[in-house]
Design a protein with these regions (language model features):
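N-terminal beta1-alpha1 cap of cysteine-dependent amidohydrolase-like domains
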Residues: 1-94
């Protein structure tokens, strides 16, 4: 059995935002095609403002900066990006 891939999306999910819905759909479509178990979780930007970010972000195999700003916390978004850059973490920004 394949190891589960865990992707954290840094952003504030809005179910009515087409790009947010499409991001989830694209990830799950790719995982299905590749037969890779996938866990996707949106990481709200306010949760990444403080020291908790250093505990939250390493749990994920890769990070995506969500499309569709503005973010509830620009500081939280920047902390997520900074974590990926300084830890050489897999990261996609849109």
């Amino acid at each position: 059995m394949a190891v589960q891939l865990r992707i954290g999306i840094i952003g504030d999910f809005e179910p009515t935002c087409h790009s947010h819905f499409a991001t989830n759909a694209a990830l799950y479509d790719a995982a299905t095609k590749l037969k890779v178990p996938l866990e996707v979780r949106w990481l709200p930007t306010p949760s990444l403002e403080g020291p908790a970010a250093e505990k939250i972000l390493p749990r994920w195999d890769g990070l995506i900066a969500s499309p569709g700003s503005p973010y509830k916390s620009f500081t939280g978004m920047l902390r997520g990006i900074e974590f990926a850059r300084t830890h050489d973490w897999p990261f996609v920004g849109t």
